[in-house]
Amino acid sequence: MKQRLFILSQYLLPHHLLSRLIGCVAECRIGWLKNRLIAWFAKQYRVDMSEAQVEDLSAYEHFNAFFTRALKAGARPLDETPGAILCPADGAISQLGVIEHGRLFQAKGHSFSATELLGGDAERAAPFMGGQFATVYLSPKDYHRVHMPLAGTLKEMVYVPGRLFSVNQTTAENVPELFARNERVVCLFDTERGPMAVVLVGAMIVASVETVWAGLVTPPKRELKSTRYDAESRGPIELAKGAELGRFKLGSTAIVLFGPQQVQWAEELTAGSTVRMGQLLGNAQL
């Protein structure tokens, strides 16, 4: 019964209004308020501040600065295995596997469309059909910056409007097409192994998503927006393996997609595996 009520609430709640209100609180600079909020959050979720560049909780100008905190140099060493594909973020593997019949496995009999995930453009999604995907869920205590699994040249960024369902095991098992329904930012790259997509998926109370090249990516009008970054227009924008790609102001999920015969995921990783940014996610197929 509790689960049914929770899922019902997900459909009834004003997702964007709640998220924007919480976003305003997260940017509050009133000293006593932001300090209490940060201290409560760090204690509640057992955040490890020993690896943060700034360990003093009161030194952050607002909650979002704390939430998107930088780590000390060396806190996330990058796997140096030849051909390594790096994990883009701290968190847990939600699912990983093959993109079969144009769909990605979600949970418990649910799947979602790769074409819809990438903004509804079949041509954009075509290079990934029959390829591989990995979904990484970032919990509240995790480091919330997302990094490049491989070096790449940015080709296109797509803002896709949508709902802001909470992202957790319960919603994954009960909300059809969850990741293809939530607001998201699609980042498409060319790499030495072919096309790569990194999708930053929003969720309830995720006030915004940022990328290192565009800053805040939440257009005032909630309509799909595509921006190309080829050499003739805005580019090229090149990011090294392990470089920061973007960040969540209150977290959610990162999904990585590759084309067919590009990568093989690490055998020890399965749904539920805890991961850290920079560790081995998979290997390039030579």
From Swiss-Prot:
The modification Pyruvic acid (Ser) is found at residue 252. Pfam families: PS_Dcarbxylase. Its EC number is 4.1.1.65. GO terms for cellular component: plasma membrane. The gene is psd. It comes from the Bacteria. This is Phosphatidylserine decarboxylase proenzyme. Binds 1 pyruvoyl group covalently per subunit. Is synthesized initially as an inactive proenzyme. Formation of the active enzyme involves a self-maturation process in which the active site pyruvoyl group is generated from an internal serine residue via an autocatalytic post-translational modification. Two non-identical subunits are generated from the proenzyme in this reaction, and the pyruvate is formed at the N-terminus of the alpha chain, which is derived from the carboxyl end of the proenzyme. It is a peripheral membrane protein. It comes from Ectopseudomonas mendocina (strain ymp) (Pseudomonas mendocina). The lineage of its organism: Bacteria, Pseudomonadati, Pseudomonadota, Gammaproteobacteria, Pseudomonadales. Catalyzes the formation of phosphatidylethanolamine (PtdEtn) from phosphatidylserine (PtdSer).
